[in-house]
């Protein structure tokens, strides 16, 4: 029997993340599962040092959870087998892999190494499928604000439409890729 650490985001899928992560018990019937609420992990270095190198890690959440994990665990070599179980509301990364929510966890070690880095106002972040700036970042920020005020599900389509019509203002960007600079206004 192997040990699998299930890192889950309880806020994913409009607050259904815990419930969806618990479905892994049906997939991993013969394994010992240790559930860890990602929002309560204060440092991934300590977490990774505390687990066996043979233990699997299963990351449960959506695209935001995946990007947050990648940045919060920056510097970790991802030597443990690392899997992704999409429990978000969008799951674009999962769809990029040709999968859908509810499929068995997919190994992602190869996808989380050597990721692109974006630096904005002196803060650098890695990203796997989205940067979190522009209209995407605006929608996530507004969604977080609404989540703090209410338990109702977040409608990101409505946020995007209202943002594009009334509130969101695009910013200029200078991007360096492989030593070449590109400007966007």
Spans of features found by a protein language model:
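ATP/NTP phosphate-donor binding region
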Residues: 1-60, 67, 71-78, 99, ...
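Catalytic core of DAGKc-family lipid kinases
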Residues: 5-8, 34-36, 75-185
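Structural motif
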Residues: 60-61, 85
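Short, contiguous clusters of charged residues that form electrostatic/catalytic patches at enzyme active sites
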Residues: 64-67, 113
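Short active-site-adjacent helix-start/loop capping segments
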Residues: 66-69, 91-93
């Amino acid at each position: 029997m192997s040990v699998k650490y299930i890192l889950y985001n309880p806020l994913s899928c409009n607050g259904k993340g815990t419930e969806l992560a618990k479905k892994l018990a049906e997939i991993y019937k013969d394994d010992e599962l240790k559930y860890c609420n990602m929002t309560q992990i204060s440092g991934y270095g300590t977490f990774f040092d505390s687990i066996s190198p043979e233990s699997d890690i299963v990351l449960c959440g959506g695209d935001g959870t995946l990007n947050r994990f990648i940045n919060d665990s920056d510097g970790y070599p991802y030597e443990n087998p690392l899997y992704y179980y999409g429990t978000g509301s969008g799951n674009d990364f999962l769809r990029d892999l040709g999968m859908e929510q509810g499929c068995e966890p997919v190994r992602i070690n190869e996808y989380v190494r050597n990721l692109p880095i974006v630096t904005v106002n002196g803060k650098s972040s890695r990203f796997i499928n989205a940067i979190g700036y522009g209209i995407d970042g605006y929608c996530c920020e507004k969604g977080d604000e609404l989540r703090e005020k209410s338990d109702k599900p977040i409608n990101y389509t409505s946020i995007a439409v209202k943002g594009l019509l009334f509130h969101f203002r695009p910013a200029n960007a200078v991007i360096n890729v492989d030593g070449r600079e590109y400007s966007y206004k």
